[in-house]
Amino acid sequence: MKILVDENMPYVEPLFGDLGDIIPVNGRTLTAEQVRDADVLLVRSVTKVNAELLSGNNKLKFVGSATIGTDHVDLAYLAERNIPFSNAPGCNATAVGEFAFIAMLELAQRFNSPLKGKVVGIVGAGNTGTATAKCLQAYGIKVLLNDPIKAAEGDPRSFVSLDTITAQADIISLHVPITRTGEHKTKHLFDEARLKALKPNTWLVNCCRGDVIDNQALIKVKRQRDDLKLVLDVWEGEPTPLPELVPLAEFATPHIAGYSLEGKARGTFMLYQKLCQLLNITADKSLLDLLPTFNIKAVELATAPNEKALLQLARFVYDLRDDDKMFRNTFLNENGFDTMRKNHQHRREFSALALAYDGQSEVDWLSNLGFSGVGQ
């Protein structure tokens, strides 16, 4: 079986090596001629999968995309040809949720304003919004969810209006897809009027799409209201964010909230599982076996951690300050934004760090937060 795979997709050899011959290709320049005799095609978002690419192939058994979105894939064409397709929804959700949570802990320390006791509004309750809520709820934080589409679909969770979040939330974390038209348009969902309506001292975290906030309006409002604190991982006009906006953010990064080693591996692993299912063979590989050993074997806790100690545990896994500093130093360079993304040392997730604790205090919340080893 000939497996054509984007050369930048990780962990392909250990997962798919037993299933066929792996042929790495440049996903951006892939041609119909290269695909002609492939049995399996594994791509990323840089490859347009359509009739032009696949019309010369009559033996394709499976197309997989190690991505959350499917904008680059002509799903109707694949369905017409009866070619099975799978992507990797939610593969980086844990990474995004932990990134947002860590950013909130960092702001809490910087401004001596504890996260505990605050109300967090999450706009968008899909995979990444749900992962963020999971972290916050594990820590005992009250969460308000806004997602009119999920609510209309009958999702059993409690939802509130965006106006309620604007009025009540101390922190707002954005997790919606970009939608440019229709009833639930998200482009400039946070326009000048909504930004001005935010509660005093609101923290605004954006880990979804830059266009969800009107960036020009954000500059204007932030200059008028220094009480607003910003964490921006995404920007209008990527890869060239407005240079005057970056200094106004407390933490600024180049669209890397989802960049974890676990998330990267999970995307490929989900495609491996799907192909094994299609071939009716056992998926006997383990996701954990793919990942390198974490550089800290375990952390012994003498007591259940307070918020300052929790931030230190989080920093053992990922220190947001490092990426923030690097981004500020490089984003104005030619290709600085994309270069930092391409060369990013994918961080680990909380699960990489084992905690050892023999005390009597209740520490299940650390396990719920994602750390391993707690209470075991």
From Swiss-Prot:
Compartments in which it is found: Cytoplasm
GO biological process: pyridoxine biosynthetic process
Stored Pfam families: 2-Hacid_dh, 2-Hacid_dh_C, DUF3410
Record-given protein name: Erythronate-4-phosphate dehydrogenase
Upper classification of the organism: Bacteria, Pseudomonadati, Pseudomonadota, Gammaproteobacteria, Alteromonadales
Keywords per UniProt: Cytoplasm, NAD, Oxidoreductase, Pyridoxine biosynthesis
Keyword NAD attached: yes
Organism: Shewanella baltica (strain OS185)
Family: Belongs to the D-isomer specific 2-hydroxyacid dehydrogenase family. PdxB subfamily.
GO molecular function terms attached to this record: 4-phosphoerythronate dehydrogenase activity; NAD binding; protein dimerization activity
